[in-house]
Amino acid sequence: MKLEKDRDVLSLKGVSVRYVDSTVALHPTSLDVKQGEFLVLLGASGAGKSTLLRSINGLVLPTKGEVSIPGLAGGVVNAKTLREHRKRCGMVFQQHHLIGRQSVLRNVLMGKLGDRGAFASLWPWSKKDKLEALTVIERVGLLEKALSRADALSGGQQQRVGIARALIQKPRILLADEPVASLDPATAHSVLTLLHEICKKDHLTAIVSLHQVELARSFADRIIGLRQGAVVFEGRAEQLSPDVARNLYAKQSNASNTSASTDSPRTLQSSQTKELLPC
């Protein structure tokens, strides 16, 4: 089903996440995201960006509030709709999560596992699947590397493989958690340019977390600024003033850092966690 332009594809309603010791990882957050929007979550490490992304993807279920997705059974992400939601949602990770000894082609094909039944996963990939994978590999500029081992690639190339793996899912929403944090500035700009161009061409909604202000200004349709687990700015890139940007990175107290210093679900209430697996 093709969604209409400018239609909301995601709504957060008072979503919050608390740790077992009651410190807050994410304060109540409400947000609507449009079809085709390139939304950037901006803030320092520990600001709550990853927690927010994982709440959207269902890797962490909110302590309070709800994530609403039009077209999803019941309209809300919960334990019953989680599998269906993740099939609609592609994920790009900072650390790639590639299988180094496997080829680029096989790593990209892993993005289709959600479409295969338990028994079908035991059989070889079809020619159709492989051609589909080669198509997305070509889109990220790595066709000549399709049969190369993933661990033989540069960091930027590995991230392109991660993008291709997400794209083969044909997602309605693409989430990217600090996708260029470990790359040098030139490579980071190149990878984000690729991601932005693909999303705009496909009218694909993207929510990308970054800590680099200039990259956010260069690529975002809209910026959500987070600090200490709370939204402190929401607006277009040109509305992000130097003072607001500095405030996002102002030194935090030790107590505040504790409340949002890690987004690892291991420290969350057990009823609110989900296994960390790609979409």
Swiss-Prot record:
<keyword id="KW-0472">Membrane</keyword>
<feature type="binding site">
    <location>
        <begin position="43"/>
        <end position="50"/>
    </location>
    <ligand>
        <name>ATP</name>
    </ligand>
</feature>
<comment type="similarity">
    <text>Belongs to the ABC transporter superfamily. Phosphonates importer (TC 3.A.1.9.1) family.</text>
</comment>
<dbReference type="InterPro" id="IPR003593">
    <property type="entry name" value="AAA+_ATPase"/>
</dbReference>
<dbReference type="InterPro" id="IPR050086">
    <property type="entry name" value="MetN_ABC_transporter-like"/>
</dbReference>
<dbReference type="InterPro" id="IPR003439">
    <property type="entry name" value="ABC_transporter-like_ATP-bd"/>
</dbReference>
<keyword id="KW-0067">ATP-binding</keyword>
<feature type="region of interest" description="Disordered">
    <location>
        <begin position="253"/>
        <end position="279"/>
    </location>
</feature>
<comment type="subunit">
    <text>The complex is composed of two ATP-binding proteins (PhnC), two transmembrane proteins (PhnE) and a solute-binding protein (PhnD).</text>
</comment>
<keyword id="KW-0547">Nucleotide-binding</keyword>
<dbReference type="GO" id="GO:0015416">
    <property type="term" value="F:ABC-type phosphonate transporter activity"/>
</dbReference>
<keyword id="KW-1003">Cell membrane</keyword>
<keyword id="KW-1278">Translocase</keyword>
<dbReference type="GO" id="GO:0005524">
    <property type="term" value="F:ATP binding"/>
</dbReference>
<dbReference type="InterPro" id="IPR012693">
    <property type="entry name" value="ABC_transpr_PhnC"/>
</dbReference>
<protein>
    <recommendedName>
        <fullName>Phosphonates import ATP-binding protein PhnC 2</fullName>
        <ecNumber>7.3.2.2</ecNumber>
    </recommendedName>
</protein>
<dbReference type="Pfam" id="PF00005">
    <property type="entry name" value="ABC_tran"/>
</dbReference>
<dbReference type="GO" id="GO:0016887">
    <property type="term" value="F:ATP hydrolysis activity"/>
</dbReference>
<feature type="compositionally biased region" description="Polar residues">
    <location>
        <begin position="263"/>
        <end position="279"/>
    </location>
</feature>
<feature type="domain" description="ABC transporter">
    <location>
        <begin position="10"/>
        <end position="253"/>
    </location>
</feature>
<keyword id="KW-0813">Transport</keyword>
<keyword id="KW-0997">Cell inner membrane</keyword>
<keyword id="KW-0918">Phosphonate transport</keyword>
<dbReference type="GO" id="GO:0005886">
    <property type="term" value="C:plasma membrane"/>
</dbReference>
<feature type="compositionally biased region" description="Low complexity">
    <location>
        <begin position="253"/>
        <end position="262"/>
    </location>
</feature>
<comment type="function">
    <text>Part of the ABC transporter complex PhnCDE involved in phosphonates import. Responsible for energy coupling to the transport system.</text>
</comment>
<dbReference type="InterPro" id="IPR017871">
    <property type="entry name" value="ABC_transporter-like_CS"/>
</dbReference>
<dbReference type="InterPro" id="IPR027417">
    <property type="entry name" value="P-loop_NTPase"/>
</dbReference>
